[in-house]
Each structure stands twice: as structure tokens, then as C-alpha cells.
Amino acid sequence: MTLTLHDIKVWNTGEVIDLIVPSDTDETVDASVMTIAPGFEDPHVHFRDPGQTYKESMVSGCAAAASGGYTNVLIMPNTVPAMDGVKVTAGEQGASEVLDAGFDTVIDYLQHYEQAHDVTLPVRYDLCVCASKGRAGKEATDVADWVGYLPEHDDDNKDAYQLCHPVTAISDDGSAVTPEILDQVFDNVKESGLYLIEHCEHHDTGAVNEGPVSRELGVPGIPEDTELRIVERDIEMARKTGVHVHFQHVSTAISFDAIRKAKAEGLPITCETAPHYIALCDEALLKYGTLAKMNPPLRSEEDRKATIAAVADGTVDLLATDHAPHTMEEKDLGFLDAPNGIIGLECAYGVCHKILVDGGFISDERLIELMSTAPAELMGHIKADITALLDEYADAVPGDDDTKRVLDLGKVPAEDRADLVVLNIDEKWTVDPERFHSSARNTPFGGWQVTGQPLATIIGSKLVFSRINKED
């Protein structure tokens, strides 16, 4: 059985084709308003599994990703216990989930999650290992504890990964790498050949951005230079060591200025920002309350505009969601006690399209690059080249203009990794968190009218999610 999409447009060439996708049902659709593109990738998600599955699990997190058009994500290491390669201890929070599944480390647990839980997850995922043991910032992790999970690359083999879910990055996300272990962590990154993902924010007090809004709320503020200090420190480390540093969720004009200068110098620096820093400033706290509380905090309107400018001029290499599920009960605790973060996988494309494309700052094609090919390059993934797939596997449409081609994904081998997303770039829709596939609902974007929606997600040539001709 197949889903046949007539007259769908290829994202980067404009070629109109027919696309046949293996499916559970037979259906033929007029796809003249649709676009086929490489699947989105997100190098910054928190799925809370193990240890906090009341917030999110691998099952619900991957379902949310597929719904948002994502085909690959990178799991951050602030699981409970932490993803540090160290054997878990019976009695510590989350340990029973790991031990009861028959494993003794979180890396092993997530490496074999599908087999242990008898599920098939609809999204590919890689793992990010902690920079410090227990993510406590006191002692660097031992490379020997996780070196066996590194990807094995073979330029002559399209199936580049020998592991299903390899460790591809190092981070203490949620915290910056501490000064005490900074040199050792950079040594570990260099030895392993990975890259460092840095949470570029360090502060001991404060809950929201320091400024008029924090004073109006009577809440301790976080100065913007708490971000800049980490950015400048790690730029200097990149200059000294040659290690690739990737800065997460950059949010201030002064940090973007420092990153621009480092890139102009040719240093191995990349950075991301998130949809919320593009769409919201700290004034959103007055409307959305703790649903707009995150770390780094939402900054000033001037910083929001600077973030958009950094996306437009190429300083920002990619967009990542920092998908961070929490319960609404936790978010109701008030500004001082509510946890930081929001979910974002299921509305990221629409929010970014509304602000960046509809706002005239970038093109449709550039947004797809920022959410697909650019993060794939960071994570070392081979993205599907749709034109190459057409050249190798397509046929002429029978009885039609012989210039029109039909691509039957059923003929494309799995090793070609045809991971794709079907988009309606012009569809207007309303964000409704109650319809999300995530277990969480903590988003300030509920009720927003956005433009552009993922309609179907394809992994390895197979349809894993579709809302085509459906209510969802």
C-alpha cells in the first residue's frame, strides 16, 4: 500500500514530481500545495527518559518530533541519572528504570531502548554524553566510559553508523562546563574527535532577564553578560586548542557580536538559537508567566531583533528547539521555583516561518536549511539529496509529459537514508497544545496563528507520521 502525492514540489529546485511513499493505506492526494524536503534535525532535545518520564518519555518525545517533521534528534545528557557512561547505582533516582531494563548505564539503556521496551520509535536519535560525571561539574567524564559508543565513519559506506544511536557530542547542557574541569573536558573532546556543545550561560542567582520587566515583577534578574562571559571564555579555548565549540541557544546581541568576530577569524565556532528567542522578548513574561521562563531567559526586544539579524546574516548556523518538557503543576510554582524551559518540536517550523519567512528576513529554502541540512552537518549525518534520488531511481510519469518524474520511495534502499518531510509552507494554522503528541503542554505559543506546517514525516523511505487529509 502506498501514499501517492501528485505534483509535489522539490524544496530547492522547484521541480514538480509525483512521490510514492510506502504506507499502511492506499491513498492518492493532490499535492500541488506541498513541498518535499530533507527531514528536520534537532541537536538539542530533552526527553526526560530515564528518571522523569512523568514529563516525557522516549516514546512521547519521538512522537512529538515526528509530528513536527523531525527525522533525527540529539538527546541531551541531563537525564536522571546523568548520561555520563558511569554505571548507575541501585537506589538513585531513575536507576530502577535502567537496571530493570537489564542495563547498567544510561547510554546502554538508550542505545537499546527499542529492544528493551518492544517499541519502534518513529525518529532516529543520537546521544550526547556528559562533560562531567553526574553532570555535577566537579570531575570530567572518562573517555574510556563512552568511547565504545562513538560513530564509526566510512566514506565509502552510505550506512555510516555502526551503532544505531551513537554518541556524537559532549555537553553539560543545563550548565556551562565549570572552570575546574575546562582543560580536561577540552582534552576529552579533542581525543574523541567529537565537538563540545556549550550551554553558554552561568549564574548562581536570578530567574528572568535583568531589566524593566524583572523589576516590574519583583524577580531577581540575570544580566546578559552571564552569557557573554562563557562565549568569550570558550572562544579563547577554541583558539587555543582547535576544538569545535557549538554554542547553544544564543540570545544576546553582545554574544552574537563576539561569535561573528570569532568566525571572521576562522575559529571552529558554530552556534544555534531557538524559536522562542526569535519570537519572544522578556515582555512575554507579563502575558504568559512561567510558560515564558527559560534559561537563558528571554531577553530584551533589542536582543530579539539582534537574534533575527544574526539568523539573517548567517551568524546563526542552525535552529534548535531546546525541547524541554515540564508538567503544568511544576510551571505553576512561580517565577522563583518553576523549572526553566518549554516544549517546541511540534510548532517550531510554524513559529519560525511566521517570524523569519513571513517577516521577510529569510527565504523558505533558507529556513529548511537552518532546520535540516545545517544541523545534519553539525551532527555528521548524510542528508537525503532529493535530486540525486530522482536521478538514480525516478521514472517518467506514464502517459504524461516525459519531463515529469515519479519517485517511488519503495525502490530506494534503506541505506540511502531517504529521511524526508512533506510541508505546506503556506498553510495557516493555530497552535493547540492539547493536540500535541508530547506528554507536556508547557508552551507560550498556544493559540498562536502561524504559517507553514509539516504534513508528513518519512524515515528510511517509509511513512512514519501523516496528517494529510486528517484532523491532526
Where in this protein do the model-derived segments appear?
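Divalent metal-coordination and catalytic microenvironments
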Residues: 8, 33, 44, 65, ...
